[in-house]
Swiss-Prot record:
GO terms for cellular component: cytosol. GO terms for biological process: cell wall organization; peptidoglycan biosynthetic process; regulation of cell shape. The lineage of its organism: Bacteria, Pseudomonadati, Pseudomonadota, Gammaproteobacteria, Alteromonadales. This is D-alanine--D-alanine ligase. It comes from Shewanella sp. (strain MR-4). Residues 124-330 form the ATP-grasp domain. ATP binds at residues 154-209.
Length: 336
């Protein structure tokens, strides 16, 4: 049986470029445990240029092969690609559209599902349409006096708000606001990251995460895990990834009533199926002191760094990551 030529594409053009390289390390290590795959790791830089781990400049062609700038090297045919890219152009759905165009099978959610989840406004509209509770919000499409006034009114009404760039990941362009004097400046900063901004009511709640993935034809939702930050903080980019982070994670959240845990998992599966996600996702919830469940966001290519929850929750659920990848990839290629 011939090996599968698997392109592990990582990097990308977002603020999460370096994080995706860490996630790619985990994928590379997991894939190396199987004898089925020839893996070529290629980094997509912030300017759209491709380079192998060995430093060879290259490109992915419409003929589904890696072509090297050094023409003495033979092109490398690609059977399958894992776009391990957090943020643009991976989780935004852009690169999946290209894969679809050249008919290259790939791991993860398809283009439309990725785009719908990455845009926080679109995602919340989907959550509501599916009947899944989520945080109160308003959205803004330009930075002007009216936007400032609407945000001031939201702050007065809700007491505390989050101002978020609508199309960024990992808490990039996300600001907690309690002081009305900071509204204008924060809005300006948020619009610097995206053309649309969402303003959400601050929810005092536990932050729970569920790994949701396809396994042998079934959609699996793990028990909720939990992110625990210092009091009066939220899970910022630095809290997620900095070595000095004081946040901690529990692979299985403690003291969550069984019926609440099951409802969270049911909502997670409903969101996965309803938004037509594929292969994997991490779905994040708030759980208030009154046991109110609110869907926060969906990550269509969750991190797989040493501190990331998705691989830990999958393993805790009894599934091996290498076996999981092999099942998905082989099943997809067999269906071609």
């Amino acid at each position: 049986m011939s090996k599968i030529n698997l392109l592990l594409l990582c990097g990308g053009g977002s603020a999460e470029h370096d994080i995706s390289l860490l996630s790619a390390n985990y994928f590379e290590t997991s894939l190396a445990k199987s004898e089925q795959f020839n893996v070529l790791r290629v980094v997509l830089d912030k300017f759209g240029q491709y380079q192998t781990a060995a430093g060879d400049d290259c490109e992915l062609t419409n003929n589904r092969e890696i072509r090297f700038r050094d023409e003495t090297k033979a092109p490398w045919p690609v059977d399958y690609v894992i776009p391990c890219i957090h943020g643009y152009p991976g989780e935004t759905g852009d690169i999946q559209s290209y894969f679809n165009l050249i008919q290259l099978p790939y791991f993860g959610c398809e283009s439309e599902a990725s785009s719908n989840c990455f845009n926080k406004i679109t995602a919340k509209m989907w959550f509501s349409a599916l009947g899944i509770p989520n945080t109160p919000y308003i959205f803004l499409n330009q930075y002007d006096d009216e936007a400032i006034a609407q945000t001031q009114a939201a702050l007065e009404n809700w007491g505390s708000i989050f101002v978020k760039a609508a199309s960024q990941g990992s808490s990039v362009g996300c600001y907690k606001v309690d002081d009305s004097s900071k509204v204008a400046g924060v809005l300006k900063d948020a619009f610097g990251y995206a053309p649309y901004v969402i303003v959400e009511k601050t929810i005092k709640a536990r932050e729970l995460e569920v790994a949701v993935y396809e396994y042998q034809g079934e959609v699996v939702a793990t028990l909720p895990g939990e992110i625990i930050c210092d009091s009066n903080t939220f899970y910022t980019f630095d809290e997620k990834y900095a070595k000095s982070s004081k946040a901690r994670t529990d692979v299985v959240a403690q003291n969550v009533p069984t019926d609440i845990s099951e409802q969270i998992r049911a909502y997670a599966i409903k969101a996965f199926k309803g938004m037509k996600l594929r292969h994997l996702s991490r779905i994040d919830f708030f759980l208030t002191q009154d046991n109110e469940i609110l869907l926060n966001e969906i990550n269509t290519f969750p991190g797989s760094t040493p501190i990331s929850m998705f691989p830990k929750m999958l393993q805790n659920h009894g599934h091996d990551f290498t076996e999981y990848l092999s099942l998905v990839i082989n099943g997809q290629l067999a269906a071609k």
